Structures are given as C-alpha cells and as structure tokens.
C-alpha cells in the first residue's frame, strides 16, 4: 500500500548548514520527523552549494518518513551574489545599489528556468529583470 502524504513543508535553508535550531527543528518536530536524519541528508545533498540559500519542499508521510526536493536558490540571492552586494535597496526607485550585466541576468534565468513558471528563456529573463528592478539593481 502506498504511504499516505500528511504534509508538505516549505523552508529556505542555507545549503550544507541545516541544523536542528529554528526554523528547521520546530517545522519538522511538529510532524514528528527525525530532525537529525533530515539535517544529515540535506547537508550531504547540498554540500557543493555551501552557503547559498536553498529552498526545500519536504513531503511528510503518515509513517513519519519523509522525502525532500531541493530547488534552485531564489533569484534575489543569485542577483545579490552577481552584483557582490549584501542586500538590495530600501528605495529601489530612487537608490540604485549595484549593477549586473545582461549576460549575468540570462545566466541566472537559465539556472532558474526549471523552477519558474516561465515557458521559455525569454520569459524567465524578464522575470529575473523584474526581480532586479525591485531590488534597486541596474542592468548594463
């Protein structure tokens, strides 16, 4: 008999740095999952991306087992890394905090394409451009 799906948990965790403290511990603990087992498997799977914020969708089953899917880092995190910034502008319409090239934007769009609802690379690029604009990052 197939396992019954009980819940889906969505978290954003630094790759290779999951630990039982919040937000991971409480989110998994309330569903009765083995927190250390998740942390070990997540850290092993994301070791090569160490430090990047990684969205993860954890599927919890009725027998307290779980599976998880890692996604690509958010476009905002990738844009900040490309522009070598700590954070975006508080007033993106007035203050521009950095800039990225169109080639960098297209590279981010290629990376994000599997996780976006965009049908093609052009639509994904426009989505990343909108994210950059909302963060106060100029496009060269």
Curated annotation (Swiss-Prot):
Q: How is it modified after translation?
A: One or more lysine residues are methylated.
One Pfam family, short name: Ribosomal_L11_N
Q: Does the keyword Ribonucleoprotein apply?
A: yes
What does the entry list under GO cellular component?
A: cytosolic large ribosomal subunit
One Gene Ontology BP term is: translation
* Key words of the record: Methylation, Ribonucleoprotein, Ribosomal protein, RNA-binding, rRNA-binding
GO molecular function, one example?
large ribosomal subunit rRNA binding
Subunit structure of this chain's protein: Part of the ribosomal stalk of the 50S ribosomal subunit. Interacts with L10 and the large rRNA to form the base of the stalk. L10 forms an elongated spine to which L12 dimers bind in a sequential fashion forming a multimeric L10(L12)X complex.
What is the purpose of this protein?
A: Forms part of the ribosomal stalk which helps the ribosome interact with GTP-bound translation factors.
- Quote the NCBIfam families the UniProt record gives: L11_bact
What family is this? Belongs to the universal ribosomal protein uL11 family.
Protein known as:
Large ribosomal subunit protein uL11
- Which species? Nitratidesulfovibrio vulgaris (strain DSM 19637 / Miyazaki F) (Desulfovibrio vulgaris)
Q: Lineage of this protein's species?
A: Bacteria, Pseudomonadati, Thermodesulfobacteriota, Desulfovibrionia, Desulfovibrionales
